[in-house]
C-alpha cells in the first residue's frame, strides 16, 4: 500500500513514538529508523523474538541500500497490509534527521526480565543506574575489574 500524507494515522504515530517517551509507554510501541537498524529488526521479527507493527520504505531507499536490505525479510516480518511505500518527501517529514534513509518501522516493545540466575549470591556487583557521562564507563569498568567485582549491572532506557 502507498501512503502520501503526513496526516496518515500511522505516520503520525511514528512521529509521536520517535519524539515522546510517554507515547512509547502508552502504546507499547517504539520507532526504528535507518537501513541497518530496520534490517536487524526484521531479522529479529522473522526469528520470532519481536513483533513488527508497521514498515515504511521509499523506492529510493530500496535502490540505494539494495546491498544492505534483505527485502524478503523486510517485507515478510509483518503482515502485507502493514507494509507501506512512502514518497521521499514524506520520508523527510517522518524524522528530524537531516538525511533520512527512507526506511522506518514501528515495533512492539518487548519486556526483558532481569535474569537472577546469572547473579552469584555471594558475589560483589557494581550497579550503574542513570549514568550521566558514558565517558566514565571505561574507568568504572576497569576499577570494578581491579577490585574483583563479579559483574556489572547497568540500567538504560531501552525505548
Question: Can you say where each PLM-predicted feature lies in the sequence?
Answer:
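N-terminal positively charged helical leader segments and presequences
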Residues: 1-103
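Glycine- and other small-residue-rich loops at beta-strand/loop junctions that grip anionic moieties
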Residues: 3, 30, 129-130, 155-156
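Amphipathic alpha-helical repeat scaffolds
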Residues: 34, 132-140
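Hydrophobic residues within beta-strands of alpha/beta enzymes
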Residues: 55, 152-153
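Acidic/glycine-rich phosphate/pyrophosphate-binding loops and surrounding catalytic core
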Residues: 96-99, 103-121
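Conserved small/polar residues in nucleotide/adenosyl-binding loops
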Residues: 159
Amino acid at each position: 500500500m502507498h501512503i502520501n500524507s503526513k496526516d496518515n494515522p500511522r505516520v503520525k504515530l511514528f512521529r509521536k513514538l520517535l519524539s515522546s517517551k510517554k507515547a512509547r509507554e502508552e502504546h507499547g510501541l517504539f520507532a526504528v529508523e535507518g537501513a541497518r537498524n530496520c534490517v536487524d529488526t526484521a531479522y529479529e521479527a522473522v526469528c520470532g523474538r519481536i513483533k513488527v507493527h508497521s514498515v515504511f520504505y521509499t523506492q529510493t531507499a530500496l535502490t540505494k541500500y539494495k546491498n544492505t536490505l534483505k527485502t524478503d525479510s523486510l517485507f515478510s516480518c509483518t503482515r502485507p497490509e502493514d507494509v507501506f511505500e512512502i514518497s521521499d518527501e514524506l520520508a523527510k517529514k517522518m524524522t528530524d534527521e537531516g538525511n533520512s534513509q527512507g526506511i522506518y518501522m514501528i515495533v512492539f516493545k518487548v519486556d526483558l526480565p532481569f535474569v537472577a540466575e546469572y547473579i552469584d549470591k555471594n558475589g560483589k556487583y557494581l550497579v550503574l543506574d542513570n549514568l550521566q557521562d558514558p565517558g566514565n564507563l571505561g574507568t568504572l569498568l576497569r576499577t570494578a575489574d581491579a577490585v574483583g567485582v563479579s559483574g556489572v549491572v547497568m540500567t538504560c532506557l531501552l525505548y
